[in-house]
Amino acid sequence: MYHKADKTMIKGYKYRLNPTPEQIVQMEKTFGCCRYVYNWALDLKIKTYQGEKRSLSAVDLCKQLTLLKKDDNHLWLNEVSNECLQQSIRCMDSAFTKFFREHTGFPKFKSKHRDKNVFKNVNSVKFDFENNRVKIPIIGWVKFFANRSFDGKIGTITVSRSSTGKFYASVLIDDGIPILDDIQ
């Protein structure tokens, strides 16, 4: 069998977090800011298309986000990780792409009560399995219940809160194992 040299296996792991009360407050802020930025970017993209008949890319929206964060009325956006906010913009942009390419539903504005509270990070995340903790930007080291460990490069970490109020970290790992060709 031959290996596909450019593709490797991606595995997902989910851990239940045990944050301190201060970390819970910071996570709630991050959930709210990410939801706000998603809705802001969706609104801006729709209005720009309706008014100027042009589409804003995720890069354009991230540049606009930098300006928004400097506005006196939006300084509170600086209290959370910029990476999470940019990931919200990328998620919204991805929803638009799927709408046009795959004919899925038109992207909807996020609601605090209807939608799941999540935020994503791509860089600067570290796991310490000896002490059962994960380092999340701005939030710091958060304890978690470790039922298994992993080896490989961390891709994306998604922090979420369930409807029961429990916090989880889902992490995608590139374990470096090549994907095998299909057997015929």
Give residue ranges: language-model regions.
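Nucleic-acid substrate recognition interfaces
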Residues: 1-184
